[in-house]
């Protein structure tokens, strides 16, 4: 297209024209329509790339169906947890059982952690602001961290009470009431576990199933596993005490053993939370594989400042500087690199800066990749 013809199109005021054969909508993440004062060359380059992150996500991108499912799971589980917690407090009081009462306290922690998770999910859905320009995505991660820490606090209290009972030996337990209450507790924990369980599909798209799991639901699920272990310990103790009342020391011993096991179940969640907060490379995204994929794009000579991190466990983000050879179409490189990254790794956001390649990049320490 000649320069004069371009200028004529820019100055023209009659009907709106589309240069790609489709209506481009301004305000919905699309390239604006040509009007006086706009750079037509920039419009043509943008049209050539045919790639825009917000347009891909669509207007309903903030209504994440996975997040909605997580909220429904937590609502149902928290309602079940609250109702049975009240019943277990009554049963523990009637049975004079510390194990049942501490199991009820564990349920209280489960309930509180689910409320924290629901609050964090609501916070993470709030739009970005000028101050919080990434949005509130990591409120979910902070909620999971608080849930894990609350497990540790309650577990410490349970261990302390179990040791205290072993030392004093001054307690009596109603084995029958304890047996009924603990049996119901096991059943309720199984129901809550099934409600919160997240099953992944059998094939992979470059991410692991753990990446697809909601961290708040995972934290709540671990809470339920811990409480299930505690309830099983109480059930075993109740069964023994029902037939052998003189073996009352079984109650604090079971509480002590199963409380220790709870701590181990929190380590995987804590590891994921720390990885996100420290902006480490997310699980399921291999740094070397990403680098090799970018270098395989035609025209790419080198790259530097490759950073891969995550807003949350399931939202990996990438930024990189790509150096291209002379006479290479920058928009073609940008389009190819972006589409390959999205196709293989499903990044939430990709930011690529195109630069001209120079020979001194080979010896520049700042341009070298990070160590293993």
From Swiss-Prot:
It comes from the Eukaryota. Changing residue 294 to V: Loss of interaction with AP3D1. Loss of localization to lysosome. It is linked to Zinc deficiency, transient neonatal: A disorder occurring in breast-fed infants as a consequence of low milk zinc concentration in their nursing mothers, which cannot be corrected by maternal zinc supplementation. A large amount of zinc, an essential trace mineral, is required for normal growth particularly in infants, and breast milk normally contains adequate zinc to meet the requirement for infants up to 4 to 6 months of age. Zinc deficiency can lead to dermatitis, alopecia, decreased growth, and impaired immune function. Residues 162-175, 242-249, 326-372 are lumenal. GO terms for biological process: intracellular zinc ion homeostasis; response to zinc ion; zinc export across plasma membrane; zinc ion import into lysosome; zinc ion import into mitochondrion; zinc ion import into organelle; zinc ion import into secretory vesicle; zinc ion import into zymogen granule. Phosphorylated at Ser-296. Phosphorylation at Ser-296 prevents localization to lysosomes. Dephosphorylation of Ser-296 which triggers localization to lysosomes, accumulation of zinc into lysosomes and lysosomal-mediated cell death is induced by TNF-alpha. Keywords: Antiport, Cell membrane, Cytoplasmic vesicle, Disease variant, Endosome, Ion transport, Lysosome, Membrane, Metal-binding, Mitochondrion, Mitochondrion inner membrane, Phosphoprotein, Transmembrane, Transmembrane helix, Transport, Zinc, Zinc transport. This is Proton-coupled zinc antiporter SLC30A2. Pfam families: Cation_efflux. One of its GO terms (molecular function) is zinc:proton antiporter activity. Zn(2+) 1 binds at residues 106, 110, 223, 227. A motif (Lysosomal targeting motif) lies at residues 294-295. Homodimer. Interacts (via lysosomal targeting motif) with AP3D1; in AP-3-mediated transport to lysosomes. Interacts with TMEM163. One of its GO terms (cellular component) is secretory vesicle. Gene3D superfamilies: Cation efflux protein transmembrane domain. Zn(2+) 2 binds at residues 53, 304, 321, 355. It catalyses: Zn(2+)(in) + 2 H(+)(out) = Zn(2+)(out) + 2 H(+)(in). Coiled coil: none annotated. The chain crosses the membrane at residues 141-161, 176-196, 221-241, 250-270, 305-325. Belongs to the cation diffusion facilitator (CDF) transporter (TC 2.A.4) family. SLC30A subfamily.
């Amino acid at each position: 297209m000649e320069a004069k013809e371009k200028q004529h199109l820019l100055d023209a005021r009659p009907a709106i024209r589309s240069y790609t054969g489709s209506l481009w909508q301004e305000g919905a993440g699309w390239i604006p329509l040509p009007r006086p004062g706009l750079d037509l060359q920039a419009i043509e380059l943008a049209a050539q790339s045919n790639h825009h992150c917000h347009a891909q996500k669509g207007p309903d991108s903030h209504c994440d169906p996975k997040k909605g499912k997580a909220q429904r799971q937590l609502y149902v589980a928290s309602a079940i947890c609250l109702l049975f917690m009240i019943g277990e407090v009554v049963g523990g009081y009637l049975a004079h059982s510390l194990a049942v009462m501490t199991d009820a306290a564990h349920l209280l922690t489960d309930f509180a952690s689910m409320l924290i998770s629901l609050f964090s999910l609501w916070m993470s859905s709030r739009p970005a602001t000028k101050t919080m320009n990434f949005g509130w995505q990591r409120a979910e991660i902070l909620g999971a961290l608080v849930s894990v820490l609350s497990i540790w606090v309650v577990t410490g209290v349970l261990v302390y009470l179990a040791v205290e009972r072993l030392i004093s030996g001054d307690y009596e337990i109603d084995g029958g009431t304890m047996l009924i209450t603990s049996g119901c507790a096991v059943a309720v924990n199984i129901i809550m576990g099934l409600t919160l369980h997240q099953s992944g599909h059998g094939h992979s798209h470059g991410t692991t199933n753990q990446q697809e799991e909601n961290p708040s639901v995972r934290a709540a699920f671990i809470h339920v596993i811990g409480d299930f272990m505690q309830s099983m310990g109480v059930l075993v103790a109740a069964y023994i005490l029902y037939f052998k009342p003189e073996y009352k020391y079984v109650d604090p011993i079971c509480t002590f053993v199963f409380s220790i096991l709870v701590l181990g179940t929190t380590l995987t969640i804590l590891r994921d939370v720390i990885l996100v907060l420290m902006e480490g490379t997310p699980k399921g995204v291999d740094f070397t594989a990403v680098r090799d994929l970018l270098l395989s794009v035609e025209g790419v000579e080198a790259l530097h400042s490759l950073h891969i991190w995550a807003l949350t466990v399931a939202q990996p983000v990438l930024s990189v500087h790509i150096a291209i050879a002379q006479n290479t179409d920058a928009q073609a490189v940008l389009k190819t690199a972006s589409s390959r990254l999205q196709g293989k790794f499903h990044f939430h956001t990709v930011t690529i800066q195109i630069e001209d390649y120079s020979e001194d990049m080979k010896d520049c320490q700042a341009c070298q990749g990070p160590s293993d």
